[in-house]
């Protein structure tokens, strides 16, 4: 991706400039500046470079996913765990880059405004020129997000991890507010930046406490210090707690999620989808590294287990209740994303319970990672459908989905598939990932109940409270059906305001249909088995560090 970043800066600036050697008449071509070449001066060039960069990086990461671990510079480790998440991030960024072809379109030979033009024509021409001008800026930021996320997955040092997270986060703050001509975009970006900056500051302060306590920020050293600790050191406890606040913001866990709905609804839909999938997965990688590697004691309950379990239930319930009353589809999907964070936090809480064996922990973490992987398909796919509506200036109200089944049955069918998968309806990939998480929680906790199965009340009183986390996931998934099915209802049973078909947008449609097909294939069959095997191998690699 570093090559792609250099290419996207240099190629659009290639021209016929020459440098004259002093005291001679010899002119040497320098290729940068002067009159730009027609081919490289095309405003669509940055998008093409971005698409190629992410495609090559994604395929390379996929091919290398099973390679042996390799240490880089003493603070980075390329292993199965880092590669599976890098592949996930690059896949999401590739979809976003392809979708943005039509969300921020570039037009060749765009006309300039003239005195005889009407105000509407002038505004339209200026909008086209602005979109052309900011192509390079947008895709540079997108590649910077990819660089930060990919390096973050390999970090074995807490300082390196925070630096990489901030590299990705600062770029996403700008991307949220990228449409500065939109009042909602600027407001969303400001809120997201302020809350994110405060969360980052708290996390960095927590990191400094951990350094004060242990004298090192290497994850292995921190783990050894934690295991050797007698009792609970205040510096260590407060340090981990502050890190949890920072990462809680990244995964949109309540009550640190308050800026997320505004950011998702104000940003362009492809960026909202990126925040709901890749950015969330980045937060969970950090949680895995800090909670599981450093703080899970052998055969004992982790310090954070009860708090994380409570946060999980509050997060999933808050997200689903808020989504029920949302009229903005992007805001609804944002609260849905909060609920999904709660489901995954519940599973992570079980790993720190002290009653989970290594094998059961592998099953649970595999389920969470698999859910993060398939979330890229159906959550980002749903945002891409909203992107299609945004190309018409719509998508910010659920009324804009009315009659979509009549206007474009294929797009409406894909959207319905995505929301069913978000709800966890079989045989889709969202059902399989939720089933694996619930199965992991139940298999760990159910055996702690009374052996007298004839008395359900006695068993319910004696079973470990972790069991009720699985029950909370089931109940909240049932609750979520109300707002997910509402989307299907308005698409197929309401009359559209216009019967005009959606714009062609071929690359955007291709991305939507790819997500829909993979949502089906990853739910059952050989593709889901292949993906589960990859994820399981990655988690095995991760658990060897514990």
Range-by-range predicted roles:
Residues 1-546:
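Alpha-helical transmembrane segments of multi-pass membrane proteins predominantly involved
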């Amino acid at each position: 991706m570093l090559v792609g970043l250099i290419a996207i800066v240099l190629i659009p600036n290639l021209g016929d400039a020459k440098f004259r050697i002093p005291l001679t008449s010899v002119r040497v071509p320098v290729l940068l500046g002067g009159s730009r070449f027609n081919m490289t001066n095309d405003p669509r060039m940055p998008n093409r470079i971005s698409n190629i960069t992410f495609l090559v990086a994604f395929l390379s990461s996929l091919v290398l996913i099973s390679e042996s671990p390799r240490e880089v510079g003493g603070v980075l480790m390329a292993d199965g765990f880092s590669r599976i998440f890098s592949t996930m991030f690059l896949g999401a960024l590739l979809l976003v880059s392809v979708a943005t072809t039509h969300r921020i379109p570039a037009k060749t030979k765009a006309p300039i405004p003239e005195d005889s033009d009407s105000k509407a024509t002038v505004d339209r021409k200026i909008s086209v020129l602005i979109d052309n001008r900011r192509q390079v800026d947008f895709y540079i930021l997108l590649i910077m997000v990819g660089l930060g996320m990919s390096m973050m997955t390999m970090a074995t040092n807490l300082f390196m991890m925070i630096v990489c997270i901030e590299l990705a986060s600062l770029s996403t703050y700008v991307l949220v507010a990228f449409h500065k001509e939109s009042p909602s975009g600027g407001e969303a970006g400001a809120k997201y930046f302020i809350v994110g900056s405060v969360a980052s500051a708290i996390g960095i302060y927590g990191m400094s406490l951990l350094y004060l306590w242990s004298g090192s920020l290497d994850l292995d050293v921190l783990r050894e210090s934690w295991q050797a600790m007698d009792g609970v050191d205040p510096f260590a406890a407060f340090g981990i707690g502050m890190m949890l606040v920072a990462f809680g913001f990244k995964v949109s866990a309540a009550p640190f999620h308050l800026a997320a709905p505004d950011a998702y609804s104000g940003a362009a839909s492809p960026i909202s989808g990126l925040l709901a999938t890749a950015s969330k997965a980045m937060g969970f990688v950090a949680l895995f590294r800090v909670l599981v590697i450093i703080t899970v004691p052998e055969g004992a309950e982790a310090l954070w287990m009860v708090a994380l379990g409570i946060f999980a239930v509050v997060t999933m319930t808050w997200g689903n209740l808020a989504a029920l009353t949302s009229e903005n589809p992007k805001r609804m999907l944002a609260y849905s994303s909060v609920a999904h964070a709660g489901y995954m936090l519940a599973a992570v809480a079980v790993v720190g319970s002290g009653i989970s064996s290594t094998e059961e922990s592998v099953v649970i973490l595999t389920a969470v990672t698999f859910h993060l992987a398939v979330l890229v398909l159906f959550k980002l796919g749903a945002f891409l459908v909203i992107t299609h509506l945004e190309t018409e200036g719509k998508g910010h109200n659920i009324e804009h989905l009315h009659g979509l089944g009549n206007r474009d049955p294929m797009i409406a069918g894909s959207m319905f598939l995505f929301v069913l998968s978000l709800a966890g309806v079989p045989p889709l990939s969202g059902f399989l990932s939720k089933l694996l998480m619930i199965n992991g929680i139940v298999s760990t906790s159910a055996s702690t109940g009374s052996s007298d199965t004839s008395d359900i009340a006695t068993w319910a009183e004696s079973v470990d409270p972790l069991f009720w986390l699985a029950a909370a996931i089931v109940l909240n998934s049932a609750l979520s059906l109300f707002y997910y099915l509402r989307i299907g209802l308005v698409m197929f049973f309401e009359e559209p305001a216009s019967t005009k078909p959606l714009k062609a947008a071929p690359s955007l449609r291709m991305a939507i249909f790819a997500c829909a097909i993979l949502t089906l294939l990853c739910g059952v069959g050989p593709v889901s088995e292949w993906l589960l095997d990859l994820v399981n191998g990655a988690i095995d690699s991760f658990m060897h560090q514990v």
